[in-house]
């Protein structure tokens, strides 16, 4: 396919046009007084949003070179969202500010590579300063404040996220679902829960809750199908003599084995329940091993040379209580050793760092949560705009996790203004690198300027006043008041601010050092002309039909 090329300043101008157009749309949503953006939908009513990344995802341009610039900034927003869960608008505004100032310097004849080196040096200094300024986010009040700010000042969301994190801990999994009531609800699942229920309803012993409840059960873990009762006779006899109940977790239990277990359960010989093992393939094996460590048992598997016929009570795990419903199994207070569980968590975390798949990382995080803390489910109030609200809660959840991970700094753009001090006295190796440092110095004022502008105030006046002040003194755009941002509950996760700055500077530097752009030439569609009808030959033989 034929290509179209752009070089030098022409290429950068086209990119800059795309960056400006996308940033103009996204920046309108920034801050507590951010404006709404209306997005057209193919079907139904348009969507109204204040979420910067949602706006960015919708934007594409017909001009391919302009579109490349926009897509690169869109990548900044997406990467920041993936890493820190928030800060997409901040990253977009910062990237635009660096690109605009940098483009002026390149147009004036400065060396793009030296500008990049100066910007990188300044980013490293500002990042270090942010980490020095960061304070740990430990108490529920700070977590609630971070969640509230990220959820566009919705205090109900901030409070319920803080409550959820308090109950399941920072390692716990918190999920968001649509509720059926008129109030937000928080449901906490204690212990390890997986999405497999009883194989047969004849295992139910609590008719009111339609569940099988086992107190102090032995837990048999088998990595294969169980079809014949002969394989597990020795285990059943041992449990019948010394244990009150038995939970069997296997790939499947069927045929004669299932029928015998049901009969034994109904006659009261052995209180038993059988469930299928969670997951599939290698993930099933890993989750069975998790359960084994949690309950101080072992997985009966031919791969490691153990068989069901030779299993003894020592092979079985134990727990304080197990509740099995039609859809879920919950193991409460497994008897596993804390040291073994912590070692398993460390091992899974190492796998999380190595994997490149977001899906795999999410599943590994769920396994950590089930071993370490628990699972909390936030059920949202039934409202017409619940999809928009659900996205807002998920953003706030990511922000609070980031705050717990790396701490918090003063919000509202104040932390970046304070971090400017790290650039005082910082020098590059030449004048062009010094210009790169100054470009970043001016660019990190842009988030505060945009927040103030969206609130309807004069940015220059407020930025100067905040810059001349100390510590956490800043401007509350929601109320129009000056004061201590931390005391006013306006906080940003350090990770969000740091990630937004680093990603913005990285992509902006790429743009400034771009010398050529290559795009496909659009295909010219041929006009659909009327084809020749041709003759009606071959009709002469129809005379014989007379």
Curated annotation (Swiss-Prot):
GO cellular component, one term: cytoplasm
Keyword Nucleotide-binding: yes
Enzyme Commission numbers on file: 5.6.1.7
Keywords, comma-separated and alphabetical: ATP-binding, Chaperone, Cytoplasm, Isomerase, Nucleotide-binding
Gene3D superfamilies: GroEL (3.50.7.10), GroEL-like equatorial domain (1.10.560.10), TCP-1-like chaperonin intermediate domain (3.30.260.10)
Residues where ATP binds: 29-32, 50, 86-90, 412, 476-478, 492
GO term, biological process aspect, one: protein refolding
Disulfide bonds: none
Family statement drawn from the similarity comment of this UniProt entry: Belongs to the chaperonin (HSP60) family.
Known role: Together with its co-chaperonin GroES, plays an essential role in assisting protein folding. The GroEL-GroES system forms a nano-cage that allows encapsulation of the non-native substrate proteins and provides a physical environment optimized to promote and accelerate protein folding. May play a protective role against the defense mechanisms generated by the infected macrophages.
Oligomeric form and interacting partners: Forms a cylinder of 14 subunits composed of two heptameric rings stacked back-to-back. Interacts with the co-chaperonin GroES.
NCBIfam families xref list: GroEL, PRK00013.1, PRK12849.1, PRK12850.1, PRK12851.1
Protein name: Chaperonin GroEL
Organism: Legionella micdadei
Gene for this chain: groEL
